[in-house]
Structure formats: structure tokens, C-alpha cells
């Protein structure tokens, strides 16, 4: 009796494997070779290609060393919080590695002088200033399908005005039009983005939901589709000013990883964005060095390997700026301790009751 049952189990497993082989060969005949495969058979699938954000702390907080390629990224926050700066820094980092980048300027507000100061190569940056939302997303789709673009930035979702709204009268009520436009575009784009390995960054603005009593009243524009399709969502906020005596020379900025499909989310990092310079790399080295225990802080003095960096944070930053070899050495040590620093970022962050993922139908 036991032998019969064993033979029955063996026969079933043989039948299953034959049926699976037949199904796979039929799929490949219908849709082409490579349309279905075992995940482990393609080693390239396991590797996550990334591009640096220009911020060492944010690269560590993202868990994979930067923003992932072949994915949709959303950067949102209040006005003048550093959204476009962060996107331009990512473009600059991609261009340093020989990447081709494009900027779809739906807001018609890109400052080329500021972009150059951030390290963007304007000669090799593709730029489009579309008239309508449909035109912007069609240009995005064409560039992504070409497979030649490494990073594409759309600035911003709120400025993607549907053609019907532009051609209509001022004050016309067209509820849900932009949300439908975004939903349709993302359905069409998502497969092309993955196949072409293009990183598409959508910059978004914040609106207030009406009549919210509990939780955050904030939401992002363009409906809910982008929240689902985005692999990484970054919430960027200005939390203070960087001053030199009485003059404001930059912003203290906090970025929270609200969503991350590549690594644990809810990590948050703080860094300085200096006017005309971008993310302060030396400031990050000092702050992250203290957090990781690589840079020692005794009172107001900062030191590294018994070498004094300076009294006060600004003096330590100046010392590292004047000594690039020492700055590189500290950066190398920080990258080796990335796991420890990432764990400490996770302790600082945490899921808010509502991280802007609420219903986007009622917007001010």
C-alpha cells in the first residue's frame, strides 16, 4: 500500500514538471524568449544599480547606496525645501559617471546658473518645457522607450496641466482630470522604465486636505497613482537656517524616506543645503562622523585620529574643505560603517500616522 502511494506522488511530480515545461515553452512561443524565466537564472536581476543623490547620509539612509535605476522616484515637500536641488544633484552625479540626463521643466522655472553651480553639465543636459501635461508625459515616454536616458526628472507633477484645462475657461471645474492623466501615464510608463533601466524622478508639491480632524492634513497632487507606482518616496523639509554671523547662507534640511521598496523605510537624515553650492559634503562628514564614532567631539572641539579639525562645526567644515585627502579618508570610513549609521537613522525616523498617503480627492 505504501509503495503504491509513493509511486502516485512521484507520478504527480513528474506530471507537474512536464506540464510546467509545456506551459513555459508555449509562453515563449507566444511572447518571445525571455518573457518568463526563473529569477535566479539571471544574475543581473539580483543586482540593484543605483545613482548617488549627492548626499552621503541620504545614500546610506536609502539602504542601497543611492536611488535605484529602472524605478519611479517621488520627491515631495513644501515650497523652497530643496526638492529641485536634490534632483539636480542626482543629475550631476549621474553625469559624472557618463550618464545621459533629461529635465522636463513643466514649471518653466529651471535656473541654469544655479544648476551649473550644483555641478550639472548644461551642454549635455536635455531640457523640455512642454505646454501641456499630455505633451510632458508623451516626451517622457518617448525618452524612456529610447533606452538611452539614465535619469529623467519631471518638475513638477502639480504643473502637469491637462490640455482640457488649458483650453477651457478660467474657473472651470474639472475634478479628477489630472489624477486620471497621471494614472494612465504611469500604467503606460512603468514597464518601459523597468526595461530601459531609466530612473524617473517626479517632483511633487503639497496640498492641504479640507476638513481633516485627525492625522496629517497634507497630501500630494496628482491623485494616488504615483504613491503606488513609486519605489522610493522622499519627504524633504526645511527645518532651519544656516547662518554666518547674521547672514543666512543655507538651509538645514531633513529628508525622510517615507516609502522604500529596496530597503527598510522610515529612515531620516539631516544635512545642510548651502546657497549656490548644494548639499554641504563637509558638513555631512562632520555630522555622520560623530554619529558613527569616527569623528570625536569633546566640548566644542572636533578631532579625527587625535588630529584637531577645529573648534565648532563651521571651523571643522572649513578644515575638511581645505584638506580633501583627510575628507576622503573620513568618507571611506563612513561608507565602511554604513550599516551602523543606517540603524541609527532608523531610530530617529518612524512611520507617521499619515505620511501624505491619504485621499487626494479634496485638495485646496
Swiss-Prot record:
Highest taxon above the source species: Bacteria
Keywords: ATP-binding, Cytoplasm, DNA damage, DNA recombination, DNA repair, DNA-binding, Nucleotide-binding, SOS response
Example GO biological process: DNA repair
Region annotated Disordered, chain positions: 343-364
Alphabetized SUPFAM superfamilies for the sequence: P-loop containing nucleoside triphosphate hydrolases (SSF52540), RecA protein, C-terminal domain (SSF54752)
GO cellular component, one term: cytosol
Pfam families the record matches: RecA, RecA_C
Annotated function: Can catalyze the hydrolysis of ATP in the presence of single-stranded DNA, the ATP-dependent uptake of single-stranded DNA by duplex DNA, and the ATP-dependent hybridization of homologous single-stranded DNAs. It interacts with LexA causing its activation and leading to its autocatalytic cleavage.
Similarity remark: Belongs to the RecA family.
Name of the featured protein: Protein RecA
Organism: Rhizobium johnstonii (strain DSM 114642 / LMG 32736 / 3841)
